[in-house]
Structures are given as C-alpha cells and as structure tokens.
C-alpha cells in the first residue's frame, strides 16, 4: 500500500502542477525528475521543518497556495527553517554524545534535558538509536513538564 502511495505521489510531483511543490523543487535546485531520495531527504524535511520550529501551517500553506509570490516566500522560509532544524539537531546530538557515559550495558537509553527543542528530539532519538543499537527515549523538560519522544 505504501509503495502505491509513493508511486502515485511521485507521478503528481513529476507533473509539477502543484505550485508549492514546483517552487520547492526550484528552491532545492532539483532539475531532474524527483525520486524517492528527493522526497525523503530534500522535499519532505523542508515541508516538515516549519512544524518542527513552530510554524506548523507553513507546509500546508505551501502545498495549498496558488500565489507564486507567497509560494516562493513560504518555500524560502521552509528552506531556512530546515537549516535551523539541522543546526539544532546537530547541536543537541553533540551535546548528548559529549555528556553520555558508557551505556553499553543498559537495554534502553532514557535521557532528559532542560529545554531541549521538542521539535527535534524524535530525530535525535532516532540518531542515537542507530548509534547505540537500542531503544532511546529523550525527554525535554520545561518547568515541571516533560515531553518525550522515542
């Protein structure tokens, strides 16, 4: 079923009829027919980046928009948010790795930190899972509230 969705989605994207997708393809400098790689590593992260840094509606507005000027503005902002997300992700991952003791005997890693950006802790948890080959739960603590992602 997922393959069918991806195949159909690629057909739609290749047609370049959606102004937002077309604009994002231009911003990403994708000049060939988009592939699964482009979806997973270039387009998808940018569309999701707004939600990760607090601008939840940007991705949807880009995909639904009909105005070239506002589509370009949204695509440019999403591209910038994606760069910010990458920096936040890299910084948090490095911070955790620098502070992490030897967890080789622990079956699960459960780590928490004050004010870790909740939009990226899931991505960082996935990176740590790959590095340590075990389940990882990260908890961002703000005041007396914790938000977790695994």
Regions found by a protein language model. Name each.
Residues 1-150:
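Hydrophobic helix-and-loop "lid/oligomerization" segment in the mid-to-C-terminal part
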């Amino acid at each position: 079923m997922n393959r069918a969705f991806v195949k159909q989605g690629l057909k739609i994207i290749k047609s370049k009829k959606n102004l937002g997708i077309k604009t994002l393809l231009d911003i990403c400098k994708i000049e060939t027919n988009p592939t699964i790689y482009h979806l997973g590593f270039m387009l998808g992260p940018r569309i999701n980046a707004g939600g990760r840094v607090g601008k939840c509606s940007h991705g949807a507005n880009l995909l639904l928009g009909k105005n070239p000027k506002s589509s370009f503005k949204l695509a440019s902002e999403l591209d910038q948010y994606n760069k910010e997300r990458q920096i936040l992700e890299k910084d948090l991952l490095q911070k955790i790795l620098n502070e992490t003791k030897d967890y080789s005997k622990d079956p699960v890693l459960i780590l928490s930190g004050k004010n870790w950006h909740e939009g990226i802790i899931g991505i960082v948890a996935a990176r740590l899972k790959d590095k340590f080959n075990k389940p990882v739960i990260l908890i961002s603590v703000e005041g007396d509230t914790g938000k977790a992602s695994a």
